Swiss-Prot record:
Pathway of action: Protein modification; protein lipoylation via endogenous pathway; protein N(6)-(lipoyl)lysine from octanoyl-[acyl-carrier-protein]
Family: Belongs to the octanoyltransferase LipM family.
Name recorded for this polypeptide: Octanoyltransferase LipM
Record-annotated BPL/LPL catalytic domain positions: 31-242
Taxonomic classification: Bacteria, Bacillati, Bacillota, Clostridia, Peptostreptococcales
Site annotation Lowers pKa of active site Cys: residues: 159
Function according to Swiss-Prot or TrEMBL: Catalyzes the transfer of endogenously produced octanoic acid from octanoyl-acyl-carrier-protein onto the lipoyl domain of GcvH, an intermediate carrier during protein lipoylation.
More info: In the reaction, the free carboxyl group of octanoic acid is attached via an amide linkage to the epsilon-amino group of a specific lysine residue of lipoyl domains of lipoate-dependent enzymes. The reaction proceeds via an octanoyl-thioester enzyme intermediate.
The protein's Enzyme Commission number: 2.3.1.181
């Protein structure tokens, strides 16, 4: 049975979390590590924006500072995500791995199936995975959780896990937010819209489309137990053995270099 590395949950600021993900991604491209599953949380809470978003056009930076909300740009695409009461995962694996479909949608589905198995082991029932929905552009905001992409995990038809994927030089990085407690009002205090009326409409729309696991099942989740069960679910899905590990010395050096990039205002505002 193939062995993958798992790095268990630690809490970091946004720039550090993104630096670590990219360091693992880069090291894998150069043959320095195994396929890796990583869990992490965010301290302080952080608003991450997609690689192609325009930070100053879409995010209220003054409000972020006032509310002590960090912000950073992801290596992946998609829209803004408020990382607060959640467990985040990332998976780094070669595109040539037979488990990874060349289709982005089908690889999303395969990973989501493993996440669902982990939730089920935690006594959490989810909806059936589906191809997502066609969304009117009138309803779109800078926020990620106001639309269902293909094969995203939902409970009561509300997205509870939002993921984004990047592929480069034959390597796949997918990371995603497993939302425990979703605060839509807090999120939209940070999101810019053209008018207050549009913000109110977008907030109501998002509240119908997204939630947190705890909000939907009505009980608290032990994050350590959830993490262990997701490892089990993904191990079953991929038919691999996860071996606990940490960053290599090479990865740690990369993290130091990449951290400076993700902390740099010019990088975060470059679009």
């Amino acid at each position: 049975m193939n062995q993958w590395r798992v790095i268990h949950n630690k809490s970091y600021e946004g720039a550090m979390n993104m630096a670590i993900d990219e360091a693992i991604f880069t090291a894998y491209k150069k043959g320095h590590n195994k396929p890796t599953l990583r869990f992490y949380t965010w301290e302080p809470a952080c608003l991450s924006i997609g690689y192609f978003q325009k930070l100053e056009d879409e995010i209220d930076l003054d409000k972020c500072r006032c509310m002590n909300i960090d912000y950073t740009r992801r290596i992946t695409g998609g829209r803004a995500v408020l990382h607060d009461n959640e467990l985040t995962y990332s998976i780094i694996i070669g595109e040539d791995n037979p488990l990874i479909d060349k289709s982005i949608n089908l690889s999303y589905r395969y990973i989501s199936e493993g996440l669902v198995k982990g939730l089920n082991l935690s006594g959490i029932e989810t909806d059936n995975l589906n191809r997502g929905e066609r969304i009117s552009r009138e309803n779109l905001s800078a926020a990620c959780f106001n639309a269902h992409a293909s094969y995203e995990v939902t409970i009561n038809n509300k997205k509870v896990i939002g993921s984004a994927q990047s592929r480069k030089d034959g390597v796949l990085l997918q990371h995603g937010s497993i939302i425990l407690d979703f605060d839509v009002e807090k999120l939209f205090k940070l999101i810019k819209t053209k008018t207050p009326e549009l913000k109110e409409r977008a907030m109501k729309f998002t509240a119908k489309k997204a939630s947190g696991i705890e909000n939907e099942i009505g009980r608290k989740i032990d994050i350590d137990i959830l993490q262990k069960n997701i490892v089990k679910g993904l191990a079953e899905q991929f038919n691999v053995e996860f071996v606990e590990g940490d960053l290599t010395d090479y990865e740690k050096q990369l993290v130091k270099e990449l951290y400076e990039k993700y902390k740099n205002e010019e990088y975060n505002k470059k679009r």
